[in-house]
């Protein structure tokens, strides 16, 4: 049982930590503008594909290296939430290399196996070109050749972009394979094993190409990307650091990770989140004596605008983990104002609005304890974690049906869900003594995949938000 009421700043900040733990264009002309088929509904079945082995015409790359690239594409196509790869066999591999892919006879053989599309890659010298066959129409789409570098880190990202190009060719919307995720890694300090540090890291969506961003040798939590302008990538992020003693919000760029204080506000600050419009930051602070919800106007070019506004407070209650809706007019957050922690939504009040006139709407009703809401980029859902039969699981609240649905299963506690830009995928962290790693899941494939491993506790994942370019 958690104790929810504290009298000092240090007490509530310790509680909030425990509360959180408990609770540029690519291939622009390579495909037609019109998609082959538009089909991306969480109620639809996955589309079967066949990925033929890469055909090697002439190259200096080793077979083992090319197999690594093929495995990356395999992972991407099996985890995009829209397709799955049919089991490979020798006869189909031969079929993919028997003459022209779009030949009627070949296409009919694929159809007979209920394979909708065939993906074939040809490597010639340093270039990889991908072909997409629609077995129903015999339509063959060709992606522009891309030059491989021989550096696995760089080529992995090229393969991710190819996977997203394939997804757009089939469904008319971008995939998420080329996106990135921020998170924290907690480890003992190298020069002082008795002291723990938590630094901000960034990785590809599959957990690979991980790199450390901050170098504070202090304790960092709650990293969150600053949403980019349309057509751009995220370049900066917010996070919370204890380098000055109390928890404060910092802003840093992804290149050097050197943080600067964002707010000149007394007390502790935690859990910053930004609106998609990049003009508002919601966060939690005890500046007025209680851990309450605050709003700060923001300009990504010049910084904070004016002073922060307290937008929700409840007597003897703790507020936490805010999340904006897509148009920035509402905030979901956690409060234990009615006893146990639950998720509420408020409309952003006008400046000067009395706190007494701000009414919160209860969202989660099925479970006693709920936390860490994350509003989907399309605005239709909120993901959150909720204690279910003693285990914290990821749940989804659907605004179209006003229903709550359990997404994850299993004995491991799950926390801190974060949506991908497509509002289909989620990343979250496990939170057990011997397992604090990141997991990937989507609404069409509810068997989670672990994407991190190794030493250190990985927590607070935040999926970068991208807008159509």
Swiss-Prot record:
The keyword DNA damage does not apply. It is found in: Periplasm. Keywords: Periplasm, Signal. It holds the Pfam family PD40. GO terms for cellular component: periplasmic space. Its main location: periplasm. Residues 1-30 form the signal peptide. Belongs to the TolB family. This is Protein TolB homolog.
